[in-house]
Amino acid sequence: MIRPAASHPAPKRTSLTAAALVATVGVALAGPVGQAGQAGTDAPATPPATQPAPPASDAALSTAQVRGAQAVKASDPVAADALKLDPVHASSGDDKGEEPARTLPAAASAYASADPDAPVAFPLPDATVTPAAPVPEVPDPARPKISGDTDPTLLRGAIDLYRKGRVADGDRMRDGFTDPAAKALLEWVAIRAGAGIGFNRTVAFVRANPDWPAGPLLRRRAEEALLSEKKAPATVRAYFATSKPVSAPGKFALALALRADGCDADAAEMIRDLWRTESFGRSLEAKVLDAFPDALTRVDHRYRMERALLKDDWESAGRAAGYAGGAYASLVRARRAVEDKSSGAAAALAAVPPSLRSDASYIFSRAQYFRRADKAEAAAAVLATAPSNPDVLVDGDEWWIERRIVARKLLDLGDAKTAYAVASQPAARSPEKRIEAEFHAGWIALRFAGDPAAAAQHFARVAAIAESPISVARAAYWQGRAAEALGQSEEAKRFYERAALQPIAYYGQVARARLGQTSLPLRAPADLEGAERQAFDGRLSIRALRLLGEAGIKELALPLYIDAARDLSDSRELQALGDLATDMKDARALVAIGKLAVQRGLPLDAHAYPTIGIPTYETFTAVPQVERAMVYAIARQESQFDPRAQSGVGARGLMQMMPATAQRTARRVSTAFDVDRLTSDPAYCARLGQAHLGELMEDWRGSYVLAFASYNAGGGNVKKWIDAYGDPRKGDVDVIDWVERIPFTETRNYVQRVMENLQVYRSRLDSRSALLIEGDLHRGAR
């Protein structure tokens, strides 16, 4: 979020720790309820259902083709959230007119973000648990028996009660357990379920379990309770003594407490921050305005309107426009008409009074209107008039997305100069979008505008921001390409060597091939042994994970695994955590643990690419055979090995097959088709998925690049890209550039991720360390 210059830096999402609560506990547990001056609120409002997920591609993609990593377990009660990012909300239709809306699933894929430089998206511990969601019982005769008094049936029953909001009944069942791990687990479930556990009980849990990995959800639950229970100002201020609020209820509660203590200026500043950065509903809006009628100005209301418009939150935008007064409502009508592709969009834009036509919202809408009318040059001219002040842009990342779409359309028209001008103007604010923007500007400058010196500067900026293996390798590889173009061969070699230090990343693998390195080393930490291992295994949270695994409640184990992985910094402990997930046969958790570790530079390469996710199956002989590593590479990207995964557009199972595609493939290989088996029988889904890959390899004459792109975006789109950008199977087409020119961001990312997965899985499954990516990129060459 971009805040006005006068406001404080954005509050960080901090974990709720025992240390942060020490100052609070004494006051909180003794503080009176119903303190004067504290206003309660309704349950924390979520942004409207019409608010879309972040864009995932640069061109219109039919929902039947949007497949990628949208896996969702239909019965999974863990709602979507994204690491270090605000939750993503589902919508229907396309996003920003060109990019398909992404219905981020409840069990978000490890690579659910289409942006390869974005933090990994997971169903994180700060996700919401649906109280009424049943706990699925997964029968498994081979499941080890839980030791002690923790009966798995009783454990599932207690969890189900808490999820249904039956706290008293859940507490009675919990009190029947004697295992401290089971008791702590059930208390954690109760807090997560949002079943009215309350502030004091939440704080008491964290104080009693200082080693429990307390994710952001526990903090949000505590903040909600501070407001709804009208805690005393002293309690509220003590709670926030060491950290800032992370939720709208928390910010409102702190503002009320500050005002009660006479800190009016600080309270007003907190309210302005709340108004500009948080999404919440009409009820809380009214309470904020009633409590602080003089704190917010027309500028604040305009900012809230602008932010809501960029998120397609029409109701909030309309209310904010009303608060701002004047003709701001005309901006909302124009923006919505353009977004909805209404035939009246031009008239709505014309109805905006001249006094508001320099407003950022009007400029954005007008640029999008021209771009959607296939007038990229006109859109670029409008974008050139956009303000540069981030406080005026409000959401620079949304502006960058529009710039990216326009720049790529201009590139397709052969206007590299204007494409570079559009891409190189700074707008993006988040690290992942800044990386994407600088990369695009550098790539266009190097490969299309003939300016390697300018490209080198942009790639250097990427390198300065990059942290994950994917983005570090990409920056270094393209720095090498720019240096080569400048005739700096030794410098280029050093950049390629830097990229090659990331052997599990696509561009790291490409750099290794360029250097003639044929090995693919995978890193692993030392084992945690002796007393340290015993202490680790004895932690209540680790024992709770084992209880969940043995009881078959994987949908609750996953967020706890992720909380633990985020808290741990010792690679040996992360390895031990992964070992536990392996013991529990939880491949999805392994992907999450491994990915979180390698993004921080920790050596958990093997755990990041589990080999336990697909059961043994017989292949069909009626279609060309594909290597087993390819099936794993696809399944990891598509579903994270969740056999019950189902996407918002209907793709199902390990291989995320669309039912119609699976039915055609079943007919081709002469086997019975059963749509339910796609999610109930992982071997069946893997078998059909492998057969479909064989069909695609046949269709594209062995081209891995085209087969992977087709698996994700459909063969029709791939044919269009061949017509537009050339055939990557031909020697006169640079396959690296061809992949980068794929107009769907999701598919660009998908092809690169599956290609890198394939290299790693060859090593993991077949003990082959040879790197074959150069050959894989050029398979099917004519």
Q: Which residues make up each language-model segment?
A:
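Compositionally biased, proline/threonine/alanine/serine-rich low-complexity intrinsically disordered stretches
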Residues: 31-153
